[in-house]
From Swiss-Prot:
Principal location class: cytoplasm
Protein name: D-aminoacyl-tRNA deacylase
PANTHER family found in the cross-reference section: D-AMINOACYL-TRNA DEACYLASE 1, D-TYROSYL-TRNA TYR DEACYLASE
GO BP field: D-amino acid catabolic process
Species whose genome carries this gene: Geobacter metallireducens (strain ATCC 53774 / DSM 7210 / GS-15)
Length: 151
């Protein structure tokens, strides 16, 4: 499971001209679910996002989590994060989870985020979305859940 997270001063998702999810200060999470991902990946990423200290303290040091700054989460499904551009000019999405599994695990990620107590807004799975954001910094990170080891 992969996520691109961005520290934002505001973000919103628009579907068919209507705002379906919005936050002020917080983290925009673009989430890609891959084949082989499981609930443990969604739980791990949610906990990582909730605790990651990417907001500045009084001294200007990245030392505070989204929870500590009373921020929000905007979670948007993004299957293209599972795209492979290594060969040719057209991305391959062979590693992306099938839509039903992607939707289920995206939903579990949102559930896990909400269980942390952080207000969490969402986009709409498989919708054509317009994502508007003001990246604060800019601050952007790529996260990937640890792959399970056989053992």
């Amino acid at each position: 499971m992969k996520a691109v997270i961005q520290r934002v001063s505001e973000a919103r998702v628009v579907v068919d001209g209507e705002v379906v999810g919005a936050i002020e200060r917080g983290i925009l999470v673009l989430l890609g679910v891959e084949k082989g991902d499981a609930e443990r990946d969604a739980a791990w990423l949610a906990e990582k996002v909730a605790g990651l200290r990417i907001f500045e303290d009084e001294a200007g040091k990245m030392n505070l989590s989204v929870r500590e700054v009373t921020g929000g989460i905007l979670a948007v499904s993004q299957f293209t994060l599972a795209g492979n551009c290594a060969k040719g000019r057209r991305p391959s999405f062979d590693t992306a989870a099938p839509p039903d599994e992607g939707k289920r695990l995206y939903g579990r990620f949102v559930d896990f985020m909400r269980e942390t107590g952080i207000p969490t807004a969402t986009g709409i799975f498989q919708a054509d979305m317009k994502v508007h954001l003001v990246n604060d910094g800019p601050v952007t990170f790529i996260l990937e859940s640890p792959k399970a080891t056989g053992g």
